Amino acid sequence: MRGYFGVGVEGVSKPMNLGNLMRIAHAFEASFFFSVAPRLKLSDANSDSSNAEGALPFYSFPHPDDFRLPLGCRLVGVEITEDAIELPRFRHPTRAAYVFGAERFSLSPAILKACDFVVKIPTRFSINVGMAGAIVLYDRLISTGGYGARPVKAGGEGGEVPPPHTWGAPLARPRDETPG
């Protein structure tokens, strides 16, 4: 899979939720993790048994105005808004950072304004931030990970996984060697 992605949360206040989201990001091979205006410290996320805090670069931004991403990285907010794109209809950017709202709060207006895209998971009501993270990252994996087509028959195995791209020698036009 080409590209990279990061995962973050704004205003997180519960250690278990921070640890859970970090573990999910680590499991899906995120390149980095971040928090915006956190209400706790990274060391409080003691619920993570995968040692994600030791495996992922972690960036903390005290205020939404301080938030920065790598050049070319697109910010994808995950929030229930009227104009949000439903996740099954969304094409994930190659270079992306996904930001989730905290337990009792929506994403702040400043973060929503910074988002290149806002997506929503088509559920009847809001779900836990860790669960939302798992759903979004699984959707990214399935839609960008090079998996074959789904089977038509229930319980059947999907199509073949396409082989990874191999780079060959540069192609060049043959020179016309006739004297002119």
Question: Predicted segments — roles?
Answer:
Residues 1-180:
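Post-transcriptional modification and biogenesis factors for structured RNAs
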